[in-house]
Each structure stands twice: as structure tokens, then as C-alpha cells.
Amino acid sequence: PGMIIQFSTGGRGRAASERGSMLHLAPDMASLATGSVNFPNGIYDNHPDLINELAQQMLDYEVKPEIEIFDLAMLYNAANLVKQGMLSEPLHVQFVFGVPNALPPIRNILNFEVSELNRLFPEATWTAAGVGRSQLDLNHWALELGGHCRTGLEDNIRYDKSRLAASNAELVGRVANLCDQYDRHVASAKEARELLALAA
């Protein structure tokens, strides 16, 4: 009960009408990348017109965006969308690291991104995501800095160097244990909704 449902509007090479085709179903949240970035085999193309169209659809259907930040410019693009009335505060931002050709998993980069987010949007919540071997590092750093964690097989299939992760549950369990280490509380579904300013 209370599970948060989030859709993805990702999808290289597709029009906004396709990438946002499910938003009329009014999930709680949907991803919104606020810029383009090089991926290993091509460009994750998010033209300003596409971003604006997806943001407007999310406003229309009362879907909270998860702002995906693959490089620093995307944070300032999100700030411009707020000024234009196309994004509503409080924001929720996801900082993504470890995608080849995008931001490397360097702690000082996350530190700066978080400091800029706090300056621009003091009420925002944020998550850090590490792709591949950087996942565990980003889990640690996010907890240390007061953020939230993303984990799971979509981003990383290994538990450690010696073996594959058995399941998403195993990776989630590891983060739950890390929360104890950093004296952080694992949110219930109800608490997560409150943190993200989502309807009950």
C-alpha cells in the first residue's frame, strides 16, 4: 500500500509524443532529463522543445518529475524551467554518475552539485545514482551528504567483484544496512511520499 509509481520518459531517438505517451495515466512521478548527454553508443538527445513538452505534460497531469542530472548544465536548465513556470517546487533531483562519456564518479563533483542544488533550491530532495561499479560508492556518498540512494539491477548487476547480485532485494538490503551505519532511517512508503511532497 502506498507504493510510489514512477514511469520513465527516456528513450533515445523517440519523439515527446512517444516518450510521454503514458503520462495521461498520471503516475506519481516520471523521469525528466533536462539536457542531452553522450552515451557510449550515441547521444541521449533531449532537445529543449522535447524537454518543454514533457515538462508541460507533467504539469498538466500532476506528475512530479524526477529531474535527471547527467552533467552540471542540466541543473541550471532545470532552474530555468522553474523560472518559466514549467517545473514546480519542491524539486526532486537525481544525480547520475558512472555512465561512460558522462560524469565520472568523483566525490568532489557530487559535493559541488549538491551545494549548487542547496543554493538554488533549499527545499529540494535528491538522490545519487552510480552506474556499474560506482553504485556502492554513490550509496555511501549520498548517505553521508544527507541525500537518498538509488540501487538495483537496472544500473548494476554485481554485488561485488566476485559475484553477481542475486536480486534487486539483495542490493536494496545492502543499502538498508548502510542506512544503519550512517544513522539514517529507511523510509516507509508513507514517509517517502511525505518527503517527496506526493499525495497520500
Language-model regions: role of each:
Residues 1-45:
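Active-site beta->alpha loop and helix N-cap motifs at the rims of alpha/beta catalytic domains
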Residues 1-7, 54-60, 112-123, 169-183:
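Alpha-helix-loop-beta-strand connector modules within alpha/beta enzyme cores
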Residues 5-8, 67-68, 192:
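Short beta-strand segments at enzyme active-site cores
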Residues 12-17, 98-103, 159, 195:
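Flexible glycine/acidic-rich beta-alpha junction loops that bind and position SAM and/or redox cofactors
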Residues 29-154, 165:
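Catalytic alpha/beta core domains of metabolic enzymes, predominantly
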Residues 148-180:
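A hydrophobic, small-residue-rich beta->alpha segment in the mid-to-C-terminal subdomain
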Residues 177-200:
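Mid-to-C-terminal alpha-helical segments outside catalytic/metal-binding sites
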